[in-house]
Every structure is written in C-alpha cells, then in structure tokens.
Amino acid sequence: MSTPHHQFESKSSTAIRRRLSSSVSSKQRPNIMTTTFASLTPMWAGVAGTLVNNNTQYEIAVTVHDGVYSTDFASVIIPVTPGDTVKNSKDIEAQVLNLIRKFSAEHLCKFLGAGITLALLKECPNLCTRLWLDMDIVPIVFNIKPFHTDSVTRPNIKHRISSTTGSYVPSGSETPTVYVEASHLGDPSHLSPNAAQKLPIPRTLDEQSDSAARKCLMYFGPNNNPRLSIGARNPVTVDAGGKIHLIDDLEEYRMTVGAGTWNAVIKLADELREKKVKIGFFSSTPQGGGVALMRHALIRFLTALDVDVAWYVPNPSPQVFRTTKNNHNILQGVAAPDLRLTQEAKDAFDAWILKNGLRWTAEGGPLAPGGVDVVFIDDPQMPGLIPLIKKVRPEVPIVYRSHIEIRNDLVHVAWSPQEEVWKYLWNNIQLADLFISHPVSKFVPSDVPTEKLALLGAATDWLDGLNKDLDPWDSPFYMGEFRPRGSHLNRGEFRSLCAKEKMHELNWPARDYIVQVARFDPSKGIPNVVDSYYKFRNLLRTRSPDMDESEHPQLLICGHGAVDDPDASIIYDQIMALVNSDPYKEYAHDIVVMRLPPSDELLNAMMANSRIALQLSTREGFEVKVSEALHTGKPVIACRTGGIPLQIQHGKSGYLTTPGEKDAVAGHFYDFYTDEALYRKMSDFARTHVSNEVGTVGNAAAWLYLAVMYSRGEKIKPNGAWINDFFREETGEPYKEGETKLPRTKLDMQG
C-alpha cells in the first residue's frame, strides 16, 4: 500500500472537461460508441526514486512540466522487501505508471516524454519499457546525482560509455560534486566528508525529479519529436546516444518472433560479442524513408544485445541528392525519357563521396585501420565508398545492399539512360564481396555474378512508434476529433496539421477512411489511388443507394518526406491538381492529402484507425508498409509489383491487382466495405500471418549471420539464395512445419 507523501496540487476544470469530451457513433455501426476528447495537452515528466527508512520503503517523486516550467509535483512512499528485487521492481513500476495515468486522466494531458533517474532505473529495470509500450512516453535516462554538482563541465555527459566505434560515443568526465563546510549544513550526520573534511550539499528527491524533467525537455525538437542526434564524423547516435530507453526488456523482442528465429539471433550475437567484431553500416540519410527506419530499429536492437555496431551517414548535399534521386527514378524507369546522368553530376557525386569517405578513412575513423571489421553499404547513393575502402583496407569484407528495383530490361539497352546510370554505379559496386537484393524477379542486372547474389526482404519494427499498439487514450491525441472549422480548440496533432494547411479533414471516428501511406513519389501510383476511390464512391451510389453519403468512407493519402527526396513537393502538387479537376473534384471534400512531419506515432495512428489499406505502387522495392498494415489487421489492396506479392496472400489477407486495374480495386473496396463477415475474416487472417522475416529481429539475424561468417574468414557464395535460410541452417534452427515465412517461389532475379 502506498503512503501519500505529497499529492498533485493542481485541479482540473470540470467545465473544460465537459466541453472537450464527446461521444461519437456511426449510423452504419450504431452499437459502436467512441468517447474522445477534442484535445490533450502535451506534457513532460521527471521521475526519481530512492530507498528510505533502512531500505524498507521506497520513495517515488514525479514532477510535471508543461514545456515552459514545472507545474506540479507528487510523491509516494511504498513498502519494499529487502532482497526481493523482482517484486520491488514491479511495485515501483506500477506506482509510477499509476501516478502518471491519474494525472493524465484528471488533467486531460498526454505525456510525451519522461526523464528517469539512473538510480530509479537500477531499482526498476523495465520501467522505461513499460512507459514506452503502455503509455507511449519516450523515456530518457539521466544520471541525476543525490548531491549538487558543479555546472561548469564538459558538455555531452552521458551515463553510458561504449567503444569509439559503437553507436554510443564516450561521455565526458563525471560532473564534480560541490562541497561546503560542515558547519553550513543543518544535519550532516548522514553525509560523508571528502578529503578536506567538507560535505556535499544534498539534492532532495523533488529536485532530482525536477532536474530530470527539465533535461528531458531538451531532447525534444520541432513538432515535439525527439531530436535526431549525429556525432563527430557523422555516426547516427541512435536514441540520443543511448539516453532514450525504448526497449530495455529483451523479452519484448523475443515475443515478436518464433523460437527458431530467436535462438538463431542469440547464438550469432554471442559469437560476435565473444570475438569483439565491429560492424559498420553506411547509408545516405538518418531520417525519412524505409532504410533509415530499418537502421534505427536495427541499431537499437543490436545494441540491446551488446553487439558492437555503428551507423554512419554523409554530410547532406542538396545538389548530390537531386542527382541520386534522378538516378533512382531512372533505374526504376519512372523518370522523364530525356533525363540523363551528366558528367558534371558524376563529378559532383564523386567529389562528395570522396570528401565524406576521407573523414572515415582518416586515423581514428570507422574505415581506418582498427575500425570496423565488416562494412554494409546501402543503396546507390554510397557505392563510391567501395573503391576507397578497398584501397585503404583491402582485407575488409564489403556487402552492398540494394533496396530498389533496377530495371533489368532497360539497363542493358545500349545508350539508354538506365544503362548509363547502371554502368556508372556498377563500376564501384562490382568491387563489393556480396550483392544483396530484395527477393523479386528481374531486380538484378545480369552483370552481377550469381555467386555473389543473396536475397533479403525489407523489415519493420513491431515495437517502435510506427507499429506498437497505441492505447485508446493516446491514439486520439494524434488523430484528433472532428470539429467544425472556426473552432478555437486544439483538435489533435493530425487535425491541427490539416487546419494549418487548409486541408479537408477526416471525420473520424464517425466515418471510416481508406489509407495509402507512402512517400510522394512518381512510382507510388497515387493517381490510380484517386481514380479507384472515385470509382468506388460511384459504386456505393449505384449499388447501395440507401446508404447516406455521410456514411461513405473518406480517402487519406499521407506519408513522410526524406532528406534525400526532392521530388515530394512536385508530386504533391500534381496530386492536388488532380483531386481538384474533373471528375474527381466531386469528392474532393472527402480526399485528404497530407505530407506529415517525422512522427512515427502519427503514421501509426493513421494506419491503425483506418478501415482498409492500399499500396497501388506501379514500381516498387519490397514495401514493408504492406506487412505493417497486415500486422494491424488491415486487409490490403495492392498491386503485383516488387515484393508486395510476397507479403499478401491473395483472397486471404487482401487482394492483389495489376497496376492500372482501377475498376478491380474499386470492386474490392466495395466488397470490404459492405460485407462485414468478409472483412473480419480477412482482418483476422492478416493479423496472424505476418512472417518473422519482416520484423527487426528476423532481419537482424541476417546481418549477424553475414558478420559471423566473414569474421570466421569464410568466403560467402550464396548463388541467389535467401540469407534467412542460411542463418537458420547454420545455427541448427530449421524452419518448422506451419511456420509463417515469405514464399520461396522460383525467382528469375536477372531476367
């Protein structure tokens, strides 16, 4: 039983609570009632704890911060059992969550982040995991001392110290404690003097929690998202260099996969730790797009396993990123026919990669002698590094990972733009020891030797902000509730963004909506999405005339931008012009097109609250967004492009169509929306039939396997086989009957 030591003193307004609350029901689904609040106020917290009364009780302090100043404080004292660390940890965890939940419910607020003292984390090791998964709070850990310390210290103090090649850079020296004469303190009996017989100034628990709250706020940037952190020589210091603790409990990762995959991961990670193998990833951008998402999740997981891994990005160059995006579009065959890779662009590209590469090959850099032992290079932005690495460290194995479609039918057409770009890139890529492609037919030019070719799908993280289950309290914070224009109330993150851009709004939860989450890219088939929706609305009018149009679902097209994607604004403008032209403008008020800020939870809420998910790409890589939708139980209607057919079981978890079959897409819309039994059947199947291979843990095993084999000095010759099959065999964990995996259909990789 907890003993109140100090209760929260602020009182919530009943009038405001009544004004903000609402219950929404749907005419089509009258038994479903959703109670929401029009707005939740963003807040931050600081949490500290310490043992008291001869270690028989534990005091917990929570400070509430509104982003400007600390506004409230509470503390409780709970009994603990000396020696029973498991029970004590669970009791402390429950009290912290209860205090924060109680304040949230009474004051209609949403805690975005919480500063946690290192002393509290030691007593309650899984507290951060529970804050993240159960309450959608970003926990940031600080070594807040119980004594006052000198503020004049070297910056970038961290409580975690790792190797210079790891993802966590070393911290500075410890902040020195401030000592004073013993006579200046009231009761010095519990304090230990220093060599000069001076005593430290105690810092009370409320001061510690307040300090944690203020420090936490410093790690949030625009749109209240955690700041991206890049270190010296451009390592991406994932999770603020280890201060952000999303998942401390490895058991959470284990529960996302089957026993075979997990056992394989542990065996491979153990060998790499024992050998102290250092792994380095190199890609073009730290944020935006699927590669960056995968790398953040991968580094987070491998660091939790104590594998020495780091991820590096170059200094950005808008000029070069325009060139790399052009190259991407040319290789996929979606660029203008007259677009060419000029010699001037090649020279600028080469100079840019050389400048960045020299920083990494210089003494102390990750590619210098003594640096990483295995190099993984992502996509056609970075292959210029390969000859430089081979020159400086010829013994280091290099793996090139291609995430995009390379039109095999075009790259070998003499004098074509595709041949020109591919020859330029292949000149460097051919020096790599391994070429990894998505498992999709005709994705690899015939120049690539089959013995060097390996297959690996893309991945997503089931525990990050993009995919974790959002609590019913948190989801409306991102979605908001529909309010008439002119309302002065904060209407939730997404609605506020729509209002800011004067975009039509979703009338959720009163109305369903269909969603396509994708970058604004010429290959994503967005015009086909708009046309299919138009045809679907006409079907509802003719086949279901009794259904009021206010009950027809809306359409949401949304996605993040990427640092290296200059096309997004151009495509966005084209889509808006299309929506407002004949014949589509009739339904323009029900079509919402939004470029969203880099908030994973925002995209999560958009997908989780939708009725149906789309992916009508005309050209595609793997597109793991499909598996993300299936994982939430959303049936997916998609095109047979790239790796999409590997993820959808046609007629069971969704429908596959040929690009441009808009009437077929509209028909599937109609079936899903009017046949509840069909929808539920497919939804349940989708939720339970997603392969381990597309999750972070299964994907990580593939990278661990390659690092292990190269560390043994073995030469890998996959001959076009799946890396997942190799690591399961190597670790003695074969696939079991009935285990869900991506189909191993015969592929014609090189056309």
UniProtKB/Swiss-Prot annotation:
Subunit (UniProt): Homodimer.
Catalytic activity: alpha,alpha-trehalose + phosphate = alpha-D-glucose + alpha-D-glucose 1-phosphate
InterPro entries: Glyco_trans_1 (IPR001296), Trehalose_Metab_GTase (IPR052078), TreT_GT1 (IPR049438)
GO molecular function per UniProt: alpha,alpha-trehalose phosphorylase (configuration-retaining) activity
Gene, per the UniProt record: TP
Known function: Reversibly catalyzes the synthesis and degradation of trehalose from glucose and alpha-D-glucose 1-phosphate. The equilibrium lies in the direction of trehalose synthesis.
The protein's name: Trehalose phosphorylase
Region (Disordered): 1-28
Any GO BP: glucose 6-phosphate metabolic process
Propeptide: 1-26
Enzyme Commission number(s) of this protein: 2.4.1.231
Variation of activity with pH: Optimum pH for phosphorolysis of trehalose is 6.7. Stable between pH 6.0 and 7.0.
Temperature sensitivity of activity: Optimum temperature for phosphorolysis of trehalose is 36 degrees Celsius. Stable below 30 degrees Celsius, activity decreases to 58% of maximum after 3 minutes incubation at 40 degrees Celsius.
UniProt entry keywords in alphabetical sequence: Carbohydrate metabolism, Glucose metabolism, Glycosyltransferase, Transferase
Protein family: Belongs to the glycosyltransferase group 1 family. Glycosyltransferase 4 subfamily.
Induction (UniProt): By heat stress, cold stress and salt stress.
Pfam families attached to this UniProt entry: Glycos_transf_1, TreT_GT1
